[in-house]
Amino acid sequence: MSDNVGLSTPRGSGTSGYVQRNLAHFRPRDNYQSYPPKDFDSLKHQPRQPDKGLLEHDRKREVEVKVFELRDKLEEEGVEEDEIETRCDELRRKLLAEMERNQNSRGAPTGPRKNLKMHQVHELADAKIKESERLRQALKISRDYQEGSHWKKQEERLKGALEREANGDSSSMPPPPAPSGPSGGNDRGGDRDRGRGRGFGRRDRDEGRLNSRERRAPPRDWDRPPTPRGRGGRGGRGGRDREVDSYRGAAGRDRSRSRSPIRERSRTRSPVRDTGRSRSPVSERSLSRSRSRSRSYSRSRSPPRRRAADSQDRSLSRSRSRSYSRSPDRDRYREKYRDRDNRD
């Protein structure tokens, strides 16, 4: 062991006696402060302050560079050493005085900032501070102004209002606005009445639409035979089918309205069917059959009747469907077999 470090002898210590510095040990910093500091809000909007010692060193270095240039020039000219020293001292004093003057003057130009490089951090920070100072003087902003202080005042005002409200001090709070309008405090009732009026208006509108549709439906001439149309015809379904569909759509809204005109028509049409049956010619019989076919088809497509309908209407519809359910194909086949039997 050397320099009285460690044990007096390595004997019995289990070590070789070699002493070295602990490389993992870090000395605590002087004037150590935790981050972020307590006054972080005040420091947040301040620009980075340059190191004044480094800036002073750079300025003195520029002065010494100019002094050495003068010395080299005088030595080349062959001037004596004493004369060179005196001239260099005069130039140094002159440049230092000029530097002090520029440093003390606040509105002085910052120098060739455009020649500063990115690694000259302290020089750039100093130039930025001087530029901000000139801008503050031009806009007449006070020195103690802090950026964002206006928002801070608003936050403090809002916080005070919330604290007063929590403490129950409602005397300083403005009174709530009085309800406007003739109804006064009965606004809820007015809104309810308005909602009811809206519902009634919609219902009246639907009923008016139904009535207008019934009015627009053209009256059908039951004495005239319907035009025959096949299944693959151009028109698809006939006008009677469209009318039935429209009544069926209207029945979803108001079933009692949509079914009443159909019943009245079926009752008024009964004498026409009786007269058609009493006629003897074949043409009239086929006409009545085609009529019955279209009517039975429309009846099958009509909307379902109510359960509480009259028994007379039910029996009437059943008898009609039984009497007119014969198709023209069956009649044709029967006539053909009849002719064949007559021939035999």
Swiss-Prot record:
Q: Which domain of life is it from?
A: Eukaryota
Q: Which GO terms describe its biological process?
A: mRNA processing; RNA splicing
| Domain CWF21 as annotated: residue spans | 55-98
Basic and acidic residues composition bias: residue spans: 38-58, 120-167, 188-226, 238-277, 307-316, 327-344
Keyword Signal in annotation: no
Specify residue ranges for compositional bias: Polar residues. Answer: 1-19
**Which keywords accompany this UniProt record?**
Coiled coil, Cytoplasm, mRNA processing, mRNA splicing, Nucleus, Spliceosome
The GO cellular component terms are: cytoplasm; nucleus; spliceosomal complex
Where are the stretches annotated Disordered? 1-58, 98-344
| Coiled coil ranges | 69-105
* Subcellular localization, as worded in the UniProt entry: Cytoplasm; Nucleus
Per UniProt, the ranges with Basic residues bias are 288-306
Chief site of localization: cytoplasm
Q: Which family does it belong to?
A: Belongs to the CWC21 family.
Please describe what this protein does. Involved in pre-mRNA splicing. May function at or prior to the first catalytic step of splicing at the catalytic center of the spliceosome. May do so by stabilizing the catalytic center or the position of the RNA substrate.
PANTHER family, per the entry: SERINE/ARGININE REPETITIVE MATRIX 2, SERINE_ARGININE REPETITIVE MATRIX 2
Q: Subunit composition? A: Associates with the NTC complex (or PRP19-associated complex). The NTC complex associates with the spliceosome after the release of the U1 and U4 snRNAs and forms the CWC spliceosome subcomplex reminiscent of a late-stage spliceosome.
The protein in question is named: Pre-mRNA-splicing factor cwc-21
Q: Which gene encodes it?
A: cwc-21
